[in-house]
């Protein structure tokens, strides 16, 4: 059973969550404000290698993981999906607390602490997002977000076998860092951690189903479309230091 869970986790990473929003006329936009001082241009010096890995990952996704996401979509109603999303978000709130702390952002650190406590208790283990109703919203932070806070640019775009799309700055997030520095993971059973990770990846893949399906069917170059969407969505989600300028790629 553990092997199946771990396999699901790995396969779920083939398409990263891009926080994309479907709008009319088959056009996709990016959630979140535009980060004017971010690195809006993708740096892809390893494109030849990345394309080969992208093709490999796409086959695995089509055969194995996309069907899992479609199954999740079909067997759960909107109410269940909302409870799952709220629960998963709450589980990762301690990670946000740690990263806001590393960013020396006291206000958002304390808001995230209170958000976790309220949703864990009054929200029945995080199944309901009670904290947002009292003004305690919190943007999910990763170690990559913290590095960006201190002026670390995304670096080269990478597509890794099985793991999927990332960049030099964020590549440890989905593999090691997010779980190594999440305090909750040290106080829960390993089986629980694996299930949480698997479910979160399944929901992430479900969220991008409309976008990935549209791109794979209609785009003349799915690699470029997905690369651009993931990169811009990620850049819109991080906050660089004031007056930060993205370094120009070396030729």
Swiss-Prot record:
Q: Which domain of life is it from?
A: Bacteria
Give the family, as the similarity comment puts it: Belongs to the MlaA family.
GO CC terms: membrane
Record-linked InterPro entries: MlaA
UniProt keywords (A-Z) are: Signal
Is Signal found in the keyword set? yes
**Name the record gives this protein:** Uncharacterized protein RP093
Q: Which GO terms describe its biological process?
A: intermembrane phospholipid transfer
Stretches that traverse the bilayer: none
Secretion signal, residue range per the UniProt entry: 1-18
